[in-house]
A protein has these predicted regions:
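Long, intrinsically disordered, low-complexity segments
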Residues: 1, 81-82, 157, 237-293, ...
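Extended ligand-binding clefts on enzyme/binding-domain cores
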Residues: 228-359
């Protein structure tokens, strides 16, 4: 019988595995779980942006099968794979036999606990209840046929793994390596997810996980960890995401490294101009007015203004996240050239090549709001895999947002001047968030989006959610936010792009021929006959793969709605 490739065969391996061998063992998990923008030399990899396309933040020209209710019952699923867990259990059951020193064994065991927690968390988000395994299994192990453990059991076990990781590892010394700091950051993220998942479904245990999130974030905010928001240059938010090395950066807790000079580059600055992604109008509208601090629904500054003018009136992070079509050729990829000739009609909209078949030329954006975040002009080259900009995995800004949200949900002090308002100051805003609404009252659009928030902190929680969406745009977290808040209805809202009045008459004449316009907004999906928003309750989880149930009927019952 063939043995699994990721299981150490020799009974003597662990007795001779020194610190270097333990490190090499841990290294195999980084490309599997620390994804960043994708693994080096992967064509078209932009993982954070692709994940945000599952949400209401970013639209692409492809189908969103989850939001459209088109994902079918699957027979197999690559995420129902247990090789990572098997590898983690192999290490945890044997590493104490290593002759390495205690500090090395503790560090690498902590890394493995981190990876086990992360892989299991990804499985819980996708499937809910899953089997919990504590030892490496063989083809004859009876545990292969056990049923699924409850979400409650699995999440408690994940929390145990994270606590062990925090206990065993030292503080960060290498920004590209898992540390105590990274384990605290993952703990804060995981516990915020689970606490709010339970809270907005009236399930027991929500306060426990929210408290863990609040405390983990608070620990990282202590001065001895040395974190602060990056605030260099006149566009610090934009500049944060185009750096080749995060060593010494006060905001980055963990990053994924790339280096084109050693054939470990990525393609994001080359691919982004060709990707046809675009920020949604719904996301655009959550950026507050820079002059008044008011939302678009309450501010007269923006009435009858084109999108390009609106951009300059908003929270400065907007124009550090997307680019303005009014900037013309100074905006990095509004115009594309084929055979020495500009093609397409209006800039900033996915357009059509002149020719015999009218095929779409995907050179710009679905919505008119081209994404500038992560784009480094110095890396915009025709050659592939020449990008060396590193990818933040955890950053201090998220920790501040977790502290504020968990605190507000618990009724604790969200420490606004140490959390949300630090983010606003870094952005260059002069208006700060307070616990009570302004004289103009609450934003009716936010109340409509989040009607389930109740209690004295309802306004504050809604505004923290706004801040989270703005600050963490295109970082792969919005879809999980929608899941945990039980807000799948947001994916059923109309999918609008930019205002059509930001185009000239000539451009608009071209656009109306190719891109639907409704109530003054570009509607990028209205030409798709398969576009029917239909996110329902079953879509909060995926089905258990049918092939797995055939092999192990104890995995039943199937997830709700997938029977």
């Amino acid at each position: 019988d063939l043995k699994p490739e990721d299981v150490i065969e020799s009974n003597h391996y662990w007795e001779t595995a020194n610190a270097s061998a333990l490190e090499q063992y841990c290294n195999t998990f980084y490309p599997k779980l620390i994804i960043g923008q994708g693994n080096p030399n992967t064509d078209g990899a932009m993982e954070f942006i692709s994940i945000d396309c599952q949400s209401d933040n970013i639209y692409s020209t492809g189908a969103n099968n989850i939001a459209w209710g088109q994902n079918l019952v699957t027979t197999s699923d690559s995420q129902w794979s247990w090789s990572i867990i098997r590898g983690c259990n192999e290490f945890l059951n044997n590493y104490q036999r290593s002759p390495a020193g205690e500090s090395a064994k503790n560090q690498y065991a902590g890394e493995i606990y981190f990876f086990k927690a992360l892989d299991y968390f990804n499985k819980v988000v996708r499937f809910g209840d899953v089997p919990w395994y504590t030892k490496p299994l063989t083809t004859n192990s009876p545990e292969l046929y056990q049923g699924r453990n409850s979400r409650y059991e699995v999440m408690d076990s994940i929390l145990m793994c994270l606590d062990r990781a925090v206990e065993l590892m030292a503080k960060k010394t290498n920004v590209a390596r898992v540390s105590k700091d990274a384990a605290l950051a993952l703990k804060a993220r995981v516990c915020l997810f689970e606490g709010t998942w339970r809270l907005y479904r009236n399930l027991e245990g929500s306060e426990k996980f929210l408290r863990e999130a609040y405390n983990a974030a608070g620990e990282l905010m202590k001065p001895e960890y040395g974190y602060s928001l990056y605030n260099t240059g006149n566009k610090p938010y934009y500049n944060l995401f185009i750096q080749d090395n995060y060593t010494g950066n006060s905001e980055i807790i963990l990053s994924k490294e790339y280096d084109a000079s050693i054939n470990m580059g990525h393609d994001i600055s080359r691919t982004l101009p060709l990707s046809n992604y675009g920020m949604s109008r719904d996301c655009f509208e959550e950026y507050l007015c820079a002059k008044t601090g008011l939302p678009i629904s309450q501010c007269s500054c923006h009435k009858n203004k084109s999108s390009s003018i609106e951009m300059r009136l908003r929270d400065p992070r907007l124009l550090q996240t997307i680019c303005n079509p009014a900037d013309g050729e100074d905006c990095y990829y509004l115009w594309k050239t084929v055979n020495g000739k500009r093609v397409g009609g209006a800039p900033n909209i996915f357009s059509y090549m002149e020719g015999t078949d009218d095929r779409p030329y995907y050179g710009t954006s679905t919505t008119g709001y081209c994404i500038a975040k992560y784009y480094n002009p110095a890396e915009y080259v025709d050659l592939r895999f020449k990008g060396s900009v590193d990818s933040p995995i955890f950053r201090y800004a998220e920790i501040l947002l977790i502290r504020a949200e968990a605190g507000a949900e618990l009724g604790e002090d969200p420490e606004l001047d140490k959390t949300i308002n630090l983010l606003r100051k870094r952005a260059g805003l002069t208006f700060m968030l307070s616990p009570t609404p302004p004289a103009e009252g609450e934003d009716p659009d936010m109340i409509e989006k989040y009607p389930d928030i109740k209690g004295p902190n309802a306004y504050l929680i809604r505004e923290i959610r706004r801040e989270r969406r703005v600050e963490l745009f295109a970082e792969g977290l919005r879809y999980m936010d929608i899941l945990r808040w039980h807000c799948g209805h947001l994916l059923n809202r109309p999918r609008r792009g930019a205002k059509s009045n930001m185009y000239t008459a000539k451009e608009l004449a071209y656009l109306t021929d190719k891109v639907p316009i409704k109530d003054g907004f570009i509607m990028p999906y209205d030409l798709r006959i398969d576009y029917q928003p239909n996110f329902t309750e079953k879509n909060y989880l995926f089905n258990i793969p049918l092939n797995e149930i055939s092999l192990n009927p104890n995995l039943l019952p199937q997830n709700p709605g997938w029977e």
